[in-house]
Regions:
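Helix-loop element at the rim of GNAT/NAT acetyltransferase active sites that forms part
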Residues: 18-31, 38
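Conserved acetyl-CoA-binding loop-helix of GNAT-fold acetyltransferases
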Residues: 99, 105-118
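Short, solvent-exposed loop/turn segments that connect beta-strands within catalytic domains
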Residues: 52-59, 170-173
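A short beta-loop-alpha structural element at the N-terminal edge
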Residues: 2-16
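Cytosolic beta-strand hydrophobic patch enriched in CBS
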Residues: 46-52
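Conserved GNAT acetyl-CoA-binding A-motif
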Residues: 113, 120-133
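Conserved catalytic-core motifs of GNAT/GCN5-like acyltransferases
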Residues: 68-71, 131, 141, 146-162
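Conserved acyl-donor/pantetheine-binding loop and adjacent beta-alpha core of acyl/acetyltransferases
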Residues: 55-59, 63-98, 104, 154-159
Length: 174
């Protein structure tokens, strides 16, 4: 499968909302309006995976997004309030890493994560943070993330784990 990773654009939001709805339960998924607010506030923090079609690239099959923040862990308010975004924030947060079901296990999620890690390094961030469910801890550890334990976040009524990747501490495998 041929695909490319590119910067997200405001005109992608409807497609991103469809991908998000396919990847997360309704209580956890960001809706189109929320994604539009995020894209407007921090477009530089969105990357999309686009599959090559007969007419060229165009079908969005995945994306990654999050705000730049000063905190080392994600709090629930960050998902709804774009005011937490700081252009010079110490950490790149990851609110979602989404790949449609039929395109999973083909390296798309890893390519998106590696692009976000590369971008955070280029911007001089101290590292990246995210929350994940217990079944995904091992996946994120492959990128150098460290598990900080159960998160204070109860987003969507789920149990989340705080993960951090800190550059310059021997954990950077990006």
């Amino acid at each position: 499968m041929a695909y490319q990773i590119r910067q997200g654009r405001l005109e992608d939001v409807t497609d991103l909302a469809e991908v998000e709805a396919a990847c997360f339960p309704a209580a956890e998924a960001a809706d189109e309006e929320s994604l539009k607010e995020r894209m407007t506030a921090f477009p530089e923090c969105f990357f999309v995976a686009e599959e090559k079609t007969e007419d060229g690239f165009g079908k969005i099959i995945g994306f990654i997004n999050g705000a730049d923040v000063d905190q080392q862990t994600i709090c629930d308010e960050m998902f709804e309030d774009t005011g937490w975004h700081k252009k010079d924030g110490r950490y790149q947060s990851i609110f979602g890493l989404d790949v449609i079901g039929s395109k999973r296990r083909q390296g798309v999620a890893a390519a998106l994560m590696n692009r976000m890690i590369e971008d955070a390094k280029e911007k001089g961030r101290a590292g990246l943070i995210l929350t994940c469910k217990d079944r995904l801890i091992h996946y994120y550890e492959k990128f150098g993330y460290r598990n900080l334990g159960v998160s204070a976040s109860v987003h969507g009524g789920a149990v989340w784990y705080d993960m951090i990747l800190e550059f310059g501490k021997g954990q950077d495998k990006g």
